Amino acid sequence: MNTKEFLNNLKTFFEKYLGENSSEKASLLEYLPEDKWLEIKNQGLLTPFLPEEYGGRVPNQTELQEVLRLAGHYGVPITLRTGIEGALVIQPLTKHAKKELIEKILPLVFKGEGGGLAITEPDSSGSAIAKEMLSYYEVLENGNIYVNAKKYWQGNSQSDFLIVAAKEKNGKKMGKSINLLFVPREYITFTPIKSEGLKAVRYAVNEIDAEIPAENLILLSELPRKSLREFQNIFIRSRLQLIGMTHGIIENIHMNVAKYLRSKIEFIRHELAEIDSRQAVSKVLYDFVCNTISPTKSV
């Protein structure tokens, strides 16, 4: 199936189940139920993020951005989860993890509640790659790995797993390099955060104080000095996905404003012009990312 056919099929599904005339229309500001999210994923939503060897599609940056744009057009929760599981789980997982671990995690993504990448912490700076990151792991004498982490997570409060970013600790010395660890649900204690501003997502503080198998470690590089650069690449690439996400959301806002507001009122015309201006800027950024960024190379 070529890109045009794939995107048309996805758009047809979105319109049928989430469009203006659908009885199941999703709210832009309400959390997307897990059964509906799984149904959407079954349409191949995440396959552009997945390498061909695991059943994905030919790498195509425009296709990635179009999927995010389409999802954004039909709801914040949909495009948010698409970006989370695509750019922050599937892409780093399939690039850095061993095949056995990849094959263990992918069914949780495509047939379960999925997961996410846990980076930011409540007890340190909000910067994703801050020197102050407190989460760490230690390789134990028995070969297992001890993980101590406290992370924010936005998605569905508690998913089937988290990919946890942490520093390696050797004795009392905390290393500078960052690696990832696959932590299943049973090792995680979580406390939901309720906020009127977070209706589209479920936010929580997740705490991990557990011993996990050594094979759950995902090294970002065999060379410790390069692991931070690889981690930065994950973070930057995920931020590039925001351009497709927000472009779809802006399109939705523009469509509804033009449809329902009385444009003959002067200040309304001014606001419409402002939205038009922002949509034009968004389109420039969108086209730039589609045409200049590689879907596979470091950014």
Predicted feature residues:
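Glycine-rich beta->alpha junctions and the first turn(s) of the following alpha-helix
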Residues: P192-A280
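Amphipathic, small/basic residue-rich leader segments at the start of a protein or domain
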Residues: M1-G83, K104
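A short, Trp-centered hydrophobic/proline-enriched beta-strand micro-motif
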Residues: P48, K111-E121
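N-terminal glycine-rich flavin-associated loop
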Residues: T79-E100, S125-A128
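A structural signal for short hydrophobic beta-strand segments in well-ordered beta-sheet cores
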Residues: S135-E138
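A short core secondary-structure module
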Residues: N144, N148-T189
